[in-house]
């Protein structure tokens, strides 16, 4: 059976340091089969430049009409079997969140 894949979506517009903290909490995961899709509405605060170079992070910048439009746009970029939305400033509680989630999904 193939390993479950996750798409973690973060939508933002000028999020400041919150974006990096959210992305870092995902990068700290022990489970490795995920992508991070950052859908940016046109930030000018330099927050995108703070993101580390990592092949699991993909950034898409395109104007949107608000958070829900941004979420809908982001869905066209995801490739994972399961999608999780995180707001800027949200953190995954510990480094095993995706591991536990994958275990639950595999039992279904």
Question: For each predicted feature, which ranges?
Answer:
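Hydrophobic/aromatic residue at the end of a short beta strand that borders the catalytic acidic motif
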Residues: 19, 67, 86, 92-97
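A conserved acidic beta->alpha catalytic loop
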Residues: 40-49, 87
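Short aromatic/hydrophobic "clamp" motif used to bind/position activated sugar donors
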Residues: 83
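Acidic helix N-cap motif at the loop->helix transition within catalytic regions
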Residues: 17-20, 45-53
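Short beta-strand/loop segment that forms part of the nucleotide-sugar
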Residues: 33-42, 60-63
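Glycine-rich, basic loop-to-helix element that forms the pyrophosphate-binding segment
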Residues: 61-78
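N-proximal low-complexity "stem/linker" segments adjacent to membrane-targeting elements
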Residues: 1-28
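Conserved donor NDP-sugar-binding/catalytic core segment of glycosyltransferases
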Residues: 91, 95-108
């Amino acid at each position: 059976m193939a390993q479950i894949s996750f798409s973690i979506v973060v939508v933002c517009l000028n999020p400041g340091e919150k974006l990096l903290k959210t992305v870092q909490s995902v990068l700290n995961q022990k489970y490795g089969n995920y992508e991070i899709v950052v859908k940016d509405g046109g930030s000018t605060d330099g927050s995108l430049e703070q993101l580390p170079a990592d092949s699991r992070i993909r950034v898409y910048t395109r104007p949107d009409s608000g958070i829900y439009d941004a979420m809908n746009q982001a869905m066209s970029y995801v490739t994972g079997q399961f999608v999780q939305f995180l707001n800027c400033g949200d953190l995954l509680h510990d480094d095993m969140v995706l591991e536990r989630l994958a275990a639950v999904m595999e039992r279904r």
